[in-house]
Amino acid sequence: MATAAAAAAVMAPPGCPGSCPNFAVVCSFLERYGPLLDLPELPFPELERVLQAPPPDVGNGEVPKELVELHLKLMRKIGKSVTADRWEKYLIKICQEFNSTWAWEMEKKGYLEMSVECKLALLKYLCECQFDDNLKFKNIINEEDADTMRLQPIGRDKDGLMYWYQLDQDHNVRMYIEEQDDQDGSSWKCIVRNRNELAETLALLKAQIDPVLLKNSSQQDNSSRESPSLEDEETKKEEETPKQEEQKESEKMKSEEQPMDLENRSTANVLEETTVKKEKEDEKELVKLPVIVKLEKPLPENEEKKIIKEESDSFKENVKPIKVEVKECRADPKDTKSSMEKPVAQEPERIEFGGNIKSSHEITEKSTEETEKLKNDQQAKIPLKKREIKLSDDFDSPVKGPLCKSVTPTKEFLKDEIKQEEETCKRISTITALGHEGKQLVNGEVSDERVAPNFKTEPIETKFYETKEESYSPSKDRNIITEGNGTESLNSVITSMKTGELEKETAPLRKDADSSISVLEIHSQKAQIEEPDPPEMETSLDSSEMAKDLSSKTALSSTESCTMKGEEKSPKTKKDKRPPILECLEKLEKSKKTFLDKDAQRLSPIPEEVPKSTLESEKPGSPEAAETSPPSNIIDHCEKLASEKEVVECQSTSTVGGQSVKKVDLETLKEDSEFTKVEMDNLDNAQTSGIEEPSETKGSMQKSKFKYKLVPEEETTASENTEITSERQKEGIKLTIRISSRKKKPDSPPKVLEPENKQEKTEKEEEKTNVGRTLRRSPRISRPTAKVAEIRDQKADKKRGEGEDEVEEESTALQKTDKKEILKKSEKDTNSKVSKVKPKGKVRWTGSRTRGRWKYSSNDESEGSGSEKSSAASEEEEEKESEEAILADDDEPCKKCGLPNHPELILLCDSCDSGYHTACLRPPLMIIPDGEWFCPPCQHKLLCEKLEEQLQDLDVALKKKERAERRKERLVYVGISIENIIPPQEPDFSEDQEEKKKDSKKSKANLLERRSTRTRKCISYRFDEFDEAIDEAIEDDIKEADGGGVGRGKDISTITGHRGKDISTILDEERKENKRPQRAAAARRKKRRRLNDLDSDSNLDEEESEDEFKISDGSQDEFVVSDENPDESEEDPPSNDDSDTDFCSRRLRRHPSRPMRQSRRLRRKTPKKKYSDDDEEEESEENSRDSESDFSDDFSDDFVETRRRRSRRNQKRQINYKEDSESDGSQKSLRRGKEIRRVHKRRLSSSESEESYLSKNSEDDELAKESKRSVRKRGRSTDEYSEADEEEEEEEGKPSRKRLHRIETDEEESCDNAHGDANQPARDSQPRVLPSEQESTKKPYRIESDEEEDFENVGKVGSPLDYSLVDLPSTNGQSPGKAIENLIGKPTEKSQTPKDNSTASASLASNGTSGGQEAGAPEEEEDELLRVTDLVDYVCNSEQL
């Protein structure tokens, strides 16, 4: 799909859907909400294809089905009943709401004929309608967060451009860029359509930040793409292919020019080098990257070869650097192409540099470009679009026509600049060719080209080619000439180069003067060219004279260049400096005219050169250029020198006026003649660094426009400069690089060149002693500030003056004095203005923003300071001081404008702490943003990181996709492949089924095991404890029964032996030993029933069994009572108190029938209190126990049966009495509720039964009390009391009662008090009843059992009397005791024992019999023993029955 997308993009017409912002919107909607709306999936290329109108012969004039389906679904989703055959009519109706004009067009022409923009806008409108008219969709969307509904840009670059990244399901990539404040989509552009373009874009973005990457990439790619234009990568990308072509052409041009350039530059490039070096110094800042780009591929080879050639040629030391420069210049044209391809500000300077080569038209172009540079500097503070408009006005009008192919209006000026830069590079290459081949022609053409660039770009290029051709023919002669006079001719060439470059710098000022200057240069150069052998001598003479004239003119041109630089600076500082610059320009132009006349006169001694140069210059340039052309070389050179030197001077000259400018120019002309010689040497270096100089010029442009680019360019040029300087040092060429004040920004590489250039200067001085020039030290080291640059220029001028003739020395002295004055004035002006500009340079010096630049600059400074420590150190110190003074105001000046004003509007980056004014950003911010804010460089880095992640992810996805496709392709030839894949799945499925079956079987087995384990657990658990309980219980019971430990056997006889004993005694013993085990035994019995209960756990079984067992005890009592003494129960006289206590005891008995856990707890709690009082009385009641023990045999016989029956009743009762569970918390309420329920049960059973029970209760209350007390004692002992506890209770007697009673009142005041009161009178009456206690105890048991029967009968239906009629062996002794024990004894035990123990045991019992048994293991075991005895008795009785 990616290839298809690329093909579609290539074939797409200008109205390609991919270039429309709506296309990205629709794609984003389809990707985000397509599945939700069930829309057809359309990858990017497919959507582009269907939206584009197919050719008439394709598709039969039908709209693609995919597009129709998409529209149909979208319209139907918003409630339109659309049919497939009439969908266009419905679409027209919808379009009426959206755009009536389009609806009319569609109605007339049909959907197929509509423009892509219209189709996309309609499709976007339909998509947006979903949010309003599709209710179902709307409801779903309303739940989403707004941020999740939107696609956010992936990042922003240094220039404020937003990058949008989209990826579809087929891994097709689209990346778009646009201005942040773009409202109409005018800046929208698609820059990436496939993976490779994404990688290229990422490389370009990285190169902008990391100059090393840029350098490497540029070396790898001749294309200037790699030296990215800071402003628009989009333009770069679009222009990349044309740039590559242009680069190839420029390389070819350069290769052709190289022989010519090498020969011409042997002489002419010396001059050009000086000028080029100056320009390079200026340009290096800006041009360094483009220069590097140019140099990167061609330069390494060409420069190395040239260096070798230069080293091989002794005389060509001057020429050698020229050759190097020629190749570098060739690289420059490449770079210019690249820079042109990349709409970088590099163009103007490069064009200026190339302008030297091409024509006066180019010179005019260069001047316009310089003006544009100034504007760019000024516009750097203006929003991009405005800048672009202004730049397009400035640059595009002169340059655009042939060169610019602007992708977007904003980028047009960039492209224009790039193209101009390419032209300048070509011009530079021609300059180099001319310099090597035809020095005179080169100079002339260079000046012509410089003059011409303002006028026409095409003629410049034409001249460029002509120059190459011309340079070819004279190249040989000139090489020969250069051998003899190479140094002088080179100096003249350098002068012309410098002049051209000065013109470039001062181009806007010089538009008028540029033509004349270029003509002068052309004359001088052509005169030199015309006189190949002697003329070169003349050329050298002319160059010296021209240098003088140039020095005078250079004062003017330098003032102009200064004004240019001042203007360039002023845009940086703000447009304030322009008016003085304009004045300077006017003065400079006037002075130039006068100087041009003077220079023409001075040059007249060389009439041949001048006329020829004028002829050539007139051809390319204007007649003015012809007139002033000979001095124009000087002027250009001087302008270059002066412009570099005299940016300050320009300001000062603007203040001083035309006259002062003229004076300065005269002095500077002298110095410049010397300086031109120096610069010729410099031109050798500069042309080696020729690329660097245009790069600097462009760099200055770029600096003004984009500070970001400057660093990489400078860094790259720094390396190139070092190489060039090393070559020049070998050659012995001395370079004086004058740094224009505007290039305050570190031209660190030029600085590096300066120390090397000084060495080369020394070498060249030795070689060029005939010339007698002392090379100026390059002011680049101090370039960051205009003051330093001027000071350095002055010092360099001083050095030159010393090495040169006395006239030159005088001129240098005058220039020094003038420059000092000018420096003072300019320092005042520039301190106010330049200092504003300086903050940029200062900031860069501080390294806060352009760290790379400053690193290089610091290195260069260190190198330069090594050679120039005396001058540079003081100057740098001054710069630092001025910078510190400015920075002292604010630690963080704006990194964009360098001004610390309005600190409240300076935003600090959250990652690097760089400060930026809100108005200096692009687009400017009106408010301080919330949250994190990152400066443009940091945003650029983040963008690179994110794009790199996306690229890696894309590579992974594409690899997977490719593998899948390969697999499919392979499988196509294997028919069984699919089947081969499926069969393994089927066996897997069968295995899964088998596993499932096994799992199901296992689960069933687990279930069975679970049930069996329940039974097993209960059985094994109970039997273990049961055996132990039997042993322990039997031993204890036997010991107690025998009067303390008479050991009987553990066989049944011993158990049945208890039958002879009083049940009370046995029960007491059992109580003491086994409090809970009885429950456990009951639980076991119950668990037998429970085996049918799936839900019941062992714990529940035990609990229920215990409760049932207790209830069964009560029921047994009832049966026994009714059977044995039905009459006695009536005979017993009832006492109200006793009846109350009996009633409570009955409640307690019944209590077990209620939910077991609660009932146990309640019983334990309540009986504790009630029967704690009875404990003392029970001691006196042992007689009654004895009498009961007589009946123990009978009880034991029928006890089990009655238990079973009662347990059954208890089950029923449990159902009825689960309500009591609520009253666990309050025993009082439980008791009351129990009483009420019992009463209710009595009523239910029968009123008669109730009456009989009441009468029985009243009669047998006292007896019942006594029996209950004994039973309570037993219950206590069995439930929770160890024998020691019981003994203590018996011993303490009343005190224990008091304790328990207190506890009772605390816990259950109402019910317990009532019971306690009833119990107390019963106690009082007990002594009376003692004689008849035996029977009475029986009776109360009977009575209780009868009452319980009534309560139980409520569940049953029969009357309790029926039970009394039933003949059962008397088990009263045991059953009533046990029942009472369970009901009463346990709670009494609780009351007697510490509440903690009682509660703990109760909770344990309630939670599970196991817990209860463990807690009171011996007691429970005894209880179990009793239960076992009961079972044995029952078995015996049943056998007897």
From Swiss-Prot:
Cross-link (Glycyl lysine isopeptide (Lys-Gly) (interchain with G-Cter in SUMO2)): 136, 215, 236, 243, 248, 252, 254, 277, 284, 288, 294, 305-306, 309, 323, 327, 337, 342, 358, 373, 381, 390, 400, 405, 415, 419, 439, 456, 463, 468, 498, 565, 662-663, 670, 677, 698, 709, 758, 768, 795, 799, 1039
InterPro entries according to UniProt: Rsf1-like (IPR028938), WHIM1_dom (IPR028942), Zinc_finger_PHD-type_CS (IPR019786), Znf_FYVE_PHD (IPR011011), Znf_PHD (IPR001965), Znf_PHD-finger (IPR019787), Znf_RING/FYVE/PHD (IPR013083)
Name used for this protein in its record: Remodeling and spacing factor 1
Designated gene of the protein: RSF1
GO cellular component: a single term: RSF complex
Positions where N6-acetyllysine occurs in the chain: 1050, 1339
Residue numbers carrying Phosphoserine: 227, 392, 397, 429, 473, 524, 570, 604, 622, 629, 748, 882, 1096, 1098, 1105, 1221, 1223, 1226, 1258, 1277, 1325, 1336, 1345, 1359, 1375
Chief location category: nucleus
PHD-type zinc finger locations on the chain: 891-941
Subcellular location: Nucleus
Keyword annotations: Acetylation, Chromatin regulator, Coiled coil, Isopeptide bond, Metal-binding, Nucleus, Phosphoprotein, Transcription, Transcription regulation, Ubl conjugation, Zinc, Zinc-finger
Region described as Disordered: spans on this chain: 215-283, 330-385, 467-634, 675-887, 983-1007, 1063-1428
Bias type Basic and acidic residues, positions: 234-257, 274-283, 330-340, 359-378, 467-480, 500-514, 565-601, 609-621, 753-770, 789-802, 816-831, 1335-1344
